[in-house]
Swiss-Prot record:
NCBIfam families: eno (TIGR01060). Disulfide bonds: none annotated. This is Enolase. Pfam families: Enolase_C, Enolase_N. PANTHER family: ENOLASE (PTHR11902:SF1). GO terms for molecular function: magnesium ion binding; phosphopyruvate hydratase activity. (2R)-2-phosphoglycerate binds at Q162, K334, R363, S364, K385. Its main location: cytoplasm. Belongs to the enolase family. Its EC number is 4.2.1.11. The active site is at E204, K334. It is found in: Cytoplasm; Secreted; Cell surface. The gene is eno. GO terms for biological process: glycolytic process.
Amino acid sequence: MPIIEQVGAREILDSRGNPTVEVEVALIDGTFARAAVPSGASTGEHEAVELRDGGDRYGGKGVKKAVEAVLDEIGPAVIGLNADDQRLVDQALVDLDGTPDKSRLGGNSILGVSLAVAKAASESAELPLFRYIGGPNAHILPVPMMNILNGGAHADTGVDIQEFMVAPIGAPSFSEALRWGAEVYHALKAVLKKAGLSTGLGDEGGFAPDVASTTAALDLISQAIEAAGFKPGVDVALALDAAANEFHADGSYTFEGTPRTAAQMTEFYAGLLGSYPLVSIEDPLYENDWDGWAALTAEIGDRVQIVGDDVFVTNPERLEEGIDRGVANALLVKVNQIGTLTETLDAVALAHHSGYRTMISHRSGETEDTIIADLAVAVGSGQIKTGAPARSERVAKYNQLLRIEEALGDAARYAGDLAFPRFVADPK
């Protein structure tokens, strides 16, 4: 039995230079694994709560308290448990914390232990992590949703939309999809230079030019797709993360300098669908605007994937309410929003059983940990969002997917355009 023997933790830095938690787990059979916890910039109010130190150190963002929680309380509680009983381990973590949002011990400390236990168990079983979590049929490689132009909370510009992504839906394999996306990324740099725009990078490795509008940004990316030798909507499609929480206040959306209602935002998105090959729109409205979300889904949900991030926060209870209300048709999956691997898998299972698509996602504050790459293949999500093909904390996930594709050999299947059944390349 892979019994947990030791649990350690330390404070490390994430990709934005902020502290985060790294956990190490050793099993009685000598197996060892570590996991690092990501952190978001634009966060939903219903997410699991991170335990931060406050005070002057690291601007209040230190995680010494979270590390102490692992060493003094969480570790001793799981030592002696069977690492390959993930549900039992995670339930012990949830019960130990005793709060609905993991605010006592911290979602960051709890998640670090949960993920490190899973990694150690997979090592003990001598199975790749994607196979350990997903079982013998895990073989679908996801479409990389590459955030090649950053705005919103991920960049210091006037662009309200947070992420402009390219999705290589026409590629024959993941490795080719990665190449296509990288070539579009480099073509975009040339397009921006020619237009006299900045080629500085945002938090997730995408370019962060100060463009005039959403449509101007989409036009630049469309030019880059064509300049790289691909056809927009056939080879490479577009996707957005509006992160509407960031421009919503007092019941109104201040978007591109104009106050708008939820209905007016819906009309705006519908107009984009008629002009650009968009396969996915994430967080188009404020997280608590259930009625607006339901109306938007009814209006355009048959033509585009509508992804719930802040509205669902990878929480099965929030997702179930959204399903009942007819909100969105896809779930964004972020392990640190809910705080354990088991709860993450439960949210994915609920989404799939309810006809919702899933997209596995990184956070803007990332580390070199690659578990989300394995998770995407394990659950067969068909989509992964982990930034631009730049910056090592982003590329690490893509490189892990290359390794998984190679390991699967002829059994590997790339999701491609089948990941977006609502999308029609030429609606006319």
